[in-house]
């Protein structure tokens, strides 16, 4: 019984990884708008978090983070903003692309488990799906502002002149 359960989890993990890679390396996963892109790659992350729990969500989130980082250096597509951030600081670009996506998957697993204890699976899945896009956006943009908010590139995007700097409260 335990072997079957582990095999099922491994198959789901592989399937979600494959779907995510397909979406990341084809136009299915991103809708580019200016320097940013709306991503649909959070869908496999949410499904993995719902079906496999926090560890599965974090694993698929890590795959999403890696594909996002690889696009900064032109592997499997390109991200103009990612390339610019990579040229500013490669390590911070990795942190900004990888950590929010992995954290998103981890927290989605916990959110699903928390809501599932209090309601049915349908409502828990609905809440988790909403939180997926919301948390991805919040984590990604927060990391972007915290790590790169005072760079010339970011200041030029939001049209702030050189003497003015963003202050974190």
What feature does the model see in each segment?
Residues 1-63:
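Hydrophobic transmembrane alpha-helices
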Residues 5-16, 38, 42, 93, ...:
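Residue-level signature of transmembrane alpha-helical entry/exit and packing/kink sites
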Residues 24-37, 63-106, 110:
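Interfacial aromatic-anchored transmembrane helix boundaries in multi-pass membrane proteins
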Residues 59-68, 125-132:
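Central hydrophobic cores of alpha-helical transmembrane segments
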Residues 72, 109-113, 137-152:
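Juxtamembrane/transmembrane-helix interface segments of polytopic membrane transporters
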Residues 98, 102, 106, 133-142:
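Mid-bilayer segments of alpha-helical transmembrane spans in multi-pass integral membrane proteins
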Residues 114-138:
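Internal alpha-helical transmembrane segments of multi-pass membrane proteins
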Residues 158-169:
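Single conserved hydrophobic/aromatic residue that forms the stacking wall/gate
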């Amino acid at each position: 019984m335990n072997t079957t359960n582990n095999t099922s989890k491994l198959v789901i993990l592989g399937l979600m990884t494959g779907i995510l890679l397909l979406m990341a390396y084809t136009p299915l996963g991103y809708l580019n708008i200016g320097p940013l892109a709306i991503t649909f790659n959070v869908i496999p992350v949410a499904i993995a978090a719902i079906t496999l729990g926090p560890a599965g969500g974090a694993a698929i989130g890590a795959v999403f983070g890696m594909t996002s980082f690889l696009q900064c250096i032109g592997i499997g597509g390109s991200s103009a903003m990612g390339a610019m951030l990579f040229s500013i600081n490669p390590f911070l670009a990795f942190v900004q692309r990888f950590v929010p996506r992995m954290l998103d998957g981890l927290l989605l697993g916990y959110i699903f488990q928390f809501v599932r204890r209090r309601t049915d699976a349908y409502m828990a899945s609905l809440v988790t799906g909403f939180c997926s896009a919301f948390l991805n956006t919040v984590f990604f943009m927060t990391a972007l502002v915290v790590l790169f908010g005072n760079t010339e590139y970011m200041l030029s995007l939001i049209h702030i002149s050189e003497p003015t700097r963003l202050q974190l409260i």
